[in-house]
Amino acid sequence: MRDKRTTIANAVSLLNDGDTLGIASPAVSPTALVSMAAVREIARQGKRDLLVVNAMAELETDLLAGAGCLREVEFWACQFFGQGTPPNIRRLMEAGQLRAREHSEFSFTLGVMAGGMGLKFIPLHGFVNDLVPQHPEWRTFDSPFDGQQLLAVTAIVPDVALIHVPRADQFGNAQFGDTNRDNVAAKFIAPQMVRAAKRVILTTEEIIPNEQIRATPDQTGILYHDVDAVVLAPRGAHPHGVTGYYEPDRDHIQQYHQAAQDPDKFRAYLDTYVHAPEGPAAYAALIGGE
């Protein structure tokens, strides 16, 4: 095992313009796995023409859309904490400047599963309808066993995946801790997204000794061989929360939502919270974190 610790700027250099970017999430909760530290750095570096794959496209995807980083989004849900469609995503889609691929929760999960298992697709029964041709990569086929028509759900294979965890060692072995107990994304979708991706950027609240990882293997959800970069990023999920570390910052979420309603105000938001802080430590100091 090699030491994979690096800076957020070096880690994000793994992402190229035009790549497919997988973001492990779900929505705002104390169990969020969203690497907002990496999302902000992607916007800061001005990455362009990205396809973002995110189970629930929310603030993190909206920030990248508003920063001009995206050409397309793929999701099973797209909403802003019960307040409708995220403002930048809505505005850009209405203007024809952002495309979308929509899944059901089940088809998205199967796509991530196929990618994590190294398969090209997974068959799905019961989804064959007149909407299938509208998805650019789905196909129907006849079962070789009984001739039944099935849907081939294409594997989701990000070029780069982002994930934030409570703790990890320097090699990339990562633990979700209490997150595993109540979060389907931590238990299944996030690890599969990591396995599916060609490269993985992992940010973490703290870096712990490998001996501690070995002592609590039941809490380890990601293994070193799937991770390419490890970045220490306290408050790295903010304004989302992390179980046992901090709660979601709902005031900041509302501040973001108000700023994103207007392009000029959103540019000011980016200047303050994305372009000005040089890395996770500076961002944590800006928001008053430890």
Enumerate the predicted regions with their spans:
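Conserved alpha/beta enzyme-core scaffold
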Residues: 1-290
